[in-house]
């Protein structure tokens, strides 16, 4: 199936026997800021308004909001520990693997961007 069809079909909230989905694969690009509870799309649990699969957990969402409101790094760490425990309870996603794309660049190229998509703007030859 082509990716355009996946994108159209994965938003259907019907059961699989009526054209909906209950699982799909995707990737999260390293360049997307998913290193904190705010930027990580995969741990969102805001129900039907959220990402495909529509996980719903008011507690996860409350902890994400509390992390944003935390006054200092120690409080953020405490909230992250609690959030991680809640994520094991509600499990909004399951990572099924990881890959790294082996890439080589010529020595005379600089300013090559990182990420999973090839972009050539800004690259310079020295």
Predicted segments with their positions:
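Periplasmic binding protein-like
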Residues: 1-42, 80
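Short linear motifs at secondary-structure transitions and domain/linker junctions
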Residues: 2, 70-74, 119
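Phenylalanine-focused residue identity feature
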Residues: 3, 24-25, 54, 93, ...
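Solvent-exposed, polar/charged alpha-helical surfaces in well-ordered, non-transmembrane soluble domains
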Residues: 8, 58-65, 74-85
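Short, solvent-exposed loop/beta-turn-alpha elements that line the ligand-binding surface or hinge
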Residues: 11-19, 38-69, 98-126
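Bilobed periplasmic-binding protein-like "clamshell/Venus-flytrap" ligand-binding domains
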Residues: 17-24, 70-107
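Short flexible/disordered coil segments
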Residues: 25-40, 61-71, 89-92
């Amino acid at each position: 199936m082509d990716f355009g069809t996946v994108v159209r079909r994965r938003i259907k909230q019907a059961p699989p026997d009526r054209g909906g989905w209950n699982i799909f694969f995707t990737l999260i690009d390293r360049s997307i800021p998913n290193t904190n509870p705010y930027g990580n799309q995969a741990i969102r649990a805001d129900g039907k308004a959220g990402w495909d699969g529509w996980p719903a957990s008011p507690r996860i969402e409350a902890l994400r909001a509390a992390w944003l409101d935390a006054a200092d790094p120690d409080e953020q760490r405490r909230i992250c520990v609690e959030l991680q425990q809640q994520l094991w309870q509600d499990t909004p996603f399951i990572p099924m693997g990881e890959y790294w794309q082996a890439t080589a660049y010529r020595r005379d190229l600089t300013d090559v961007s990182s990420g999973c998509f090839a972009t050539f703007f800004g690259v310079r030859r020295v």
